[in-house]
């Protein structure tokens, strides 16, 4: 029997091609790390099923984006993949999962950053708010869609956030303090 998230992935990624492989491999790595981090926080009573589902769907919108290096041949700029994914998941009746999509880019993106960098996004804050949203966003920073077989160090993950501005680095450092150094999870290749 298919999981709910698998049916959504199958709908938007029906072909067994490189893009689907990239999405599934990256998302499984993010889900595994997010779940490992969540299990460190038993007192928080986190929704582990939701964490797995939302982590598996957080990048669903890449199919609509133009990023040939990862086999995406859509029309939207890559920075908009979170918003695109959120739109897709809201259409599927998954508003809680949609919030993860639109809030995971960088360490979240502020309205101020959107304005100052002239990003093609609505002028509003896209910041992870719930603990589940934060854990998935944090876990995502340790995996790239171009190097599926590697997990980044904290230093490498932080460096990759520099393009989003100092406020994202500050949020990321707070997550390192709150959630700790991530355990090594074997990337799902």
Model-derived regions, located:
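Divalent metal-dependent catalytic cores for phosphoryl transfer on phosphate-bearing substrates
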Residues: 43-150, 154
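Generic structural signal for well-ordered, non-transmembrane alpha-helical segments
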Residues: 28, 32, 95, 177-180
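A general alpha-helix detector
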Residues: 8-12, 33, 84-85, 138, ...
């Amino acid at each position: 029997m298919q999981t709910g998230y698998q049916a959504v992935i199958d709908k938007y990624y029906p072909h067994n091609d490189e893009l689907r492989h990239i999405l599934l491999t990256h998302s499984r790595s993010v889900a595994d790390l997010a779940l490992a981090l969540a299990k460190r926080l038993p007192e928080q009573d986190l929704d582990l099923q939701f964490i797995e589902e939302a982590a598996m769907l957080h990048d669903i919108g890449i199919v609509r984006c133009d990023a040939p290096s990862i086999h995406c041949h859509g029309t939207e700029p890559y920075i908009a993949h979170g918003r695109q994914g959120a739109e897709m998941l809201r259409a599927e009746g998954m508003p809680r999962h949609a919030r993860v999509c639109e809030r995971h880019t960088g360490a979240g993106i502020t309205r101020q950053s959107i304005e100052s960098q002239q990003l093609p996004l609505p002028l509003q804050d896209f910041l992870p708010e719930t603990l589940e949203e934060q854990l998935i966003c944090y876990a995502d920073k340790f995996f790239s869609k171009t190097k599926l077989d590697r997990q980044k160090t904290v230093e490498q993950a932080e460096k990759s956030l520099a393009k989003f501005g100092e406020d994202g680095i500050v949020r990321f450092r707070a997550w390192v303090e709150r959630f700790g150094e991530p355990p090594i999870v074997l990337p799902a290749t």
